[in-house]
């Protein structure tokens, strides 16, 4: 419906999924930090759009928001193992500190959208790191201790 929109406040290093179905004129939006990504929130939004709007994943267009990148997102070994088990080896790369690995959250997000039926060419990964872009983006990992508090970003999608 033109003019309809969704807003998702409160994400920082976590990403957001933006999903649009131009055929059914439907949108979906979800917060996708490590918990949501591991729980396949993107695929869940695709299924919800199928059920509620009759959307076909092949028609959907998806994008991710800025999020912490694979060069800056260090997680502990047990979490890295869960991601590799869920999405395949390579989502977590060479260990950082002992007992840790680097997590490619965007790769896991893309994998679940492709497995849910979206075409690769209809998925755009923002590839803008919240941790690295200090001038423009808030990063929970980078800024919370430095600022003595917290900050957030909001995501919004609207049919015009």
Question: What spans do the regions from the language model cover?
Answer:
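Active-site microenvironment for binding and transforming phosphate-containing groups
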Residues: 1-160
């Amino acid at each position: 419906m033109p003019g309809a929109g969704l807003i998702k406040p409160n994400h920082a290093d976590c990403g957001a999924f933006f999903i649009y179905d131009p055929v059914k004129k439907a949108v979906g939006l979800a917060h996708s930090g490590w918990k949501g990504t591991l729980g396949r929130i993107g695929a869940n939004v695709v299924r919800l759009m199928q059920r509620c709007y009759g959307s076909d994943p092949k028609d959907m267009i998806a994008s991710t928001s800025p999020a912490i990148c694979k060069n800056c997102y260090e997680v502990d070994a047990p979490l890295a193992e869960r991601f590799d088990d869920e999405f395949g080896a390579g989502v977590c790369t060479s260990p950082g500190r002992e007992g840790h690995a680097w997590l490619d959250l965007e790769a896991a997000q893309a994998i679940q959208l492709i497995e849910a039926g979206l075409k690769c060419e209809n998925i755009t990964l923002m590839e803008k790191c919240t941790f690295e872009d200090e001038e423009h983006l808030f990063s929970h990992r980078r800024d919370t201790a430095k600022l003595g508090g917290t900050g957030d970003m909001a995501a919004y999608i609207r049919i015009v």
